[in-house]
Amino acid sequence: MLKNDLFLRALKRQPVPRTPIWVMRQAGRYLPEYRAIREKTDFLTLCKTPELATEVTIQPVDIIGVDAAIIFSDILVVNEAMGMNVEIIESKGIRLSPPIRSQVDIDRLIIPDINEKLGYVMDALRMTKKELDGRVPLIGFSGAAWTLFTYAVEGGGSKNYAFAKKMMYREPKMAHMLLSKISRVITEYLLMQIEAGADAVQIFDSWASALSEDDYREFALPYIKESVQAVKTKYPDTPVIVFSKDCNTILSDIADTGCDAMGLGWNMDISKARAELKDRVTIQGNMDPTVLYGTHDKIRAEAGKILERFGQHSECSGHVFNLGHGILPDVDPENLKCLVDFVKEESTKYH
């Protein structure tokens, strides 16, 4: 039994006494307690050690007071489970090898047994669930097919996604074959996370804004919808959040996937998003992460604007306060604590 279920109730657009808050990348480098653990181990080992992943997952709940925990992991564990070599190199970035650029490469990728290849994530979820003891809900997550596709084809991060788009435009059938294969794994991965104890799941499409509206509808949304529908079919009471970064012009299309909530980037007025969506889904967001570099007064002022612009809640509205992207690693934890405390206090007047 959850002692604090505000996050889940907000995702289901049920009445809540205040706006719940958590932030993307809340378990991370801005926390000295996290850095102390990272000094002793590398990033992927941390992801793959359930005891350590559990500890860092719970840190922001204990230290900051957020209303939900999100399991500590990385979106690229899916690529690794499918047979790619994933390296996260300090100060150099991410490298995946070999890059997937031909039919032979696609055929070489496996559809893994999730429990075998990603069992450490399930162990971390179960362990975290036990340690949380119902204090707050636990979120599972995956990258979206398009974002994982770009990493696979580019062999890492990219500025212009040239190899990924070359496959899209020259070999669209091949691109869809790879996207479909990745999507199958994502869907099974999300289902297994729920089975292991996740109370909600989020799909991160971090590179969504690299695509035009038409291309996003063709190469990204169908696979998000596939995963959302699979989750809602098997676990109808488990909320699904879709975060398609900076896709502000196709909000209705994203809502049409059947998701319960939608992450909103900071470059759109939340009042406009709510007006367009007409409370069909919960809106999650949407403060600029760099606001947390500001003074406490500035942080409160900017958070207050978002609460005010979302406005008074109706019987079927939902808002989860979050950043428009992940918290930056050099933010002062006290600034995030200021934000969380302010939202908890100030949001009551809108409910």
UniProtKB/Swiss-Prot annotation:
Cellular compartment(s): Cytoplasm
Xref: PROSITE patterns: UROD_1 (PS00906), UROD_2 (PS00907)
Keywords tagged on the record: Cytoplasm, Decarboxylase, Lyase, Porphyrin biosynthesis
Major site of localization recorded for this protein: cytoplasm
InterPro entries: UROD/MetE-like_sf, Uroporphyrinogen_deCO2ase_HemE, Uroporphyrinogen_deCOase
Coiled coil: none
GO molecular function annotations of the record: uroporphyrinogen decarboxylase activity
Pathway where this protein functions: Porphyrin-containing compound metabolism; protoporphyrin-IX biosynthesis; coproporphyrinogen-III from 5-aminolevulinate: step 4/4
Lyase found in the keyword field: yes
Subunit structure and binding partners: Homodimer.
Protein name: Uroporphyrinogen decarboxylase
Species of origin: Chlorobium phaeobacteroides (strain BS1)
Organism placement in taxonomy: Bacteria, Pseudomonadati, Chlorobiota, Chlorobiia, Chlorobiales
Encoding gene per record: hemE
